[in-house]
């Protein structure tokens, strides 16, 4: 095999197509089931300061910085009062926030039932699967139902058809992730152990900690959580409960089909179609609550987001492969058409009469309605070809030519031509290398040159006129990259195969 660049850059027009196992021909129908149940638990827990140690290090930090101590820790009398408060409301060590957000023994189960069989000319494989997984972090649950079908049909001696389609429905509950300011796990790591999880049944609250009741509403479920007293983090348990009021659902349909016609033993035509369709729906609700100055929402908010994405690709190729003595000649001609369309509609409103989840509908809001959305479309048409020559599996040469037209660029700059060429010499097959065959089974020297296009820009970006950053430039087209490479590929003796590649490459973007 002789390749020049990644096939998705040079020849392969179908960059995204569903591909799974096919049904078996001439097999009796077989029904199978596999599944599992399990439990997940973090194997390692962070060691956090208890309440007494937290006070000690908090005072030490203030003293070393030449600052006044926090009033609650300034005197031994206050410290004793704080530790008494902690002991009666959270236990002697205080709140271990990591434990409060972790779901020990998170249950998970998966089930899959499949049917596989066929006749002499038709094979079918169909499977139905269900997954239900509780997250290790509370509130991060996941459910999925998937249905996959694969079809394999031998229409005649020279004509065959394969097709597959998969449908996946996912439902998720999310937590705030990857945000050092508000993330649930970050908050659990940064919240102090003095603060109890809840504030609705506290006892022996020192007067200098009375701010823990700021904004407290006894009849508001989301107001029962304590605002963190000695850091700017949010109460992670309350945050999880609020985010549980929002649901996220996704639907995916992925399908592909390939019609193959062997015109002659040396000439083959393929027509491939692929699609990738997705839909997503977010039903969001942010309740009204106040825990402290860092953790509050003045109004409850109803949010609904709908988005869709459609991707289609249709590719036609005509391939030629024939041998003449020690010569092997290959050629390929093809065309590919791709289209992507995306749209999104987002709506929100505030001022729902209460925090009842049943009232979390857009029509129930009274203030600050907002609607936004956008469409996005792009397409690409490609023509490509390849010629390869192989003599005695020792001397190999290949040339590719690709012409792409992308709707992302301005008129007059939509099309680009991208040639590439490579050559290789399998010197391990030469007669002067016979003495090495006991330890070197394959060694090849190759060199290549290729021009690679790049359409990784936003659609319509060329229409931008003014901007304040380097990214707001008028884009007539995207840079091309010229790549020159050379290398040696070796494979050790087949009985103890060890392979390696030594290569060098130079790229220039213009």
Label every PLM stretch briefly.
Residues 15-19, 32-34, 162, 446-448:
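Soluble periplasmic/extracytoplasmic beta-strand elements of cell-envelope proteins
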Residues 8-12, 140-143, 177-179, 436-441:
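Short, glycine-/polar-rich solvent-exposed loops and beta-turns at beta-strand/coil boundaries
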Residues 43-79, 168-226, 339-355, 443-487:
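A surface-exposed, glycine/aromatic-enriched loop/edge motif typical of exported proteins
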Residues 109, 144-146, 150-159, 164-169, ...:
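Extracellular/periplasmic, surface-exposed regions of secreted and cell-surface proteins
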Residues 84, 293-294, 406:
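Extracytoplasmic gating/loop element in the C-terminal half of outer-membrane beta-barrel translocons
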Residues 20-22, 35-37, 117, 320, ...:
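Flexible glycine-/small-residue-rich
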Residues 2-16, 23-29:
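Flexible, glycine/serine/threonine-rich loop segments and coil->beta-strand junctions
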Residues 23-138, 176-179, 195-247, 260-262:
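Residues embedded in well-ordered regular secondary structure
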């Amino acid at each position: 095999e002789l390749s020049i660049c990644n096939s998705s850059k040079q020849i392969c027009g179908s960059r995204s197509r569903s591909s799974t196992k096919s049904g078996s021909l001439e097999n009796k129908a077989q029904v199978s089931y596999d599944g599992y149940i399990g439990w997940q638990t973090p194997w390692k827990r962070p060691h956090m300061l208890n309440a007494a140690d937290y006070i000690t290090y908090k005072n030490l930090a203030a003293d070393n910085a030449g600052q006044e101590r926090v009033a609650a820790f300034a005197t031994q009398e206050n410290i004793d009062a704080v530790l008494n408060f902690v002991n009666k409301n959270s236990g002697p060590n205080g709140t271990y926030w990591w434990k409060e957000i972790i779901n020990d023994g998170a249950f998970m189960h998966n089930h899959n039932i499949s049917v596989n069989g066929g006749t002499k000319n038709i094979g079918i494989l169909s499977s139905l699967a269900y997954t239900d997984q509780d997250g290790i972090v509370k509130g991060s649950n996941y459910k999925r139902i998937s249905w996959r079908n694969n079809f394999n049909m031998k229409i005649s001696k020279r004509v065959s058809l394969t097709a597959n389609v998969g449908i996946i429905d996912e439902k998720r509950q999310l937590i705030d992730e990857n945000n050092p300011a508000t993330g649930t796990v970050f908050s659990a790591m940064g919240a102090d152990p003095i603060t109890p999880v809840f504030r609705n049944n506290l006892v022996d609250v020192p007067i200098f900690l009375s701010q823990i009741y700021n904004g407290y509403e006894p009849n508001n479920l989301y107001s029962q959580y304590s605002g963190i007293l000695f850091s700017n983090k949010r109460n992670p348990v309350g945050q999880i409960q609020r985010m549980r009021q929002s649901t996220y659902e996704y639907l995916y349909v992925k399908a592909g089909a390939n019609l193959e016609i062997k015109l002659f033993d040396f000439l083959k035509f393929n027509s491939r179609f692929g699609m990738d369709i997705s839909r997503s729906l977010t039903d969001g609700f942010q309740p009204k609550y106040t825990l402290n100055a860092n953790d509050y929402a003045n109004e409850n908010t109803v949010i609904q987001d709908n988005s869709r994405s459609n991707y289609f690709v249709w590719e036609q190729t005509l391939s030629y492969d024939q041998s003449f003595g020690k010569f092997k000649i290959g050629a390929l001609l093809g065309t590919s058409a791709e289209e992507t369309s995306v749209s999104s509609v987002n709506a929100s409103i505030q001022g729902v009469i209460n925090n009842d989840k049943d009232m979390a509908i857009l029509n129930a809001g009274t203030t600050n309605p907002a609607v936004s959305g956008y469409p996005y479309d792009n397409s690409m048409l490609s023509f490509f070809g390849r010629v390869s020559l192989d003599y005695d599996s020792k001397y190999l040469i290949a040339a590719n030519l690709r012409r792409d037209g992308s709707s992302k660029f301005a008129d007059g700059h939509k099309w680009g031509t991208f040639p590439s060429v490579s050559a290789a010499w399998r010197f391990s097959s030469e007669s002067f290398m016979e003495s090495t065959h006991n330890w070197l089974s394959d060694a090849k020297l190759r060199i290549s040159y290729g021009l690679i296009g790049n359409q990784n820009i936003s659609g319509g970006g060329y229409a931008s006129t003014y901007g304040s950053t380097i990214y707001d430039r008028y884009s007539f087209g995207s840079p091309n990259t010229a790549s020159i490479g050379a290398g040696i590929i070796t494979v050790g003796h087949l009985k103890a195969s060890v392979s390696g590649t030594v290569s060098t490459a130079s790229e220039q973007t213009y």
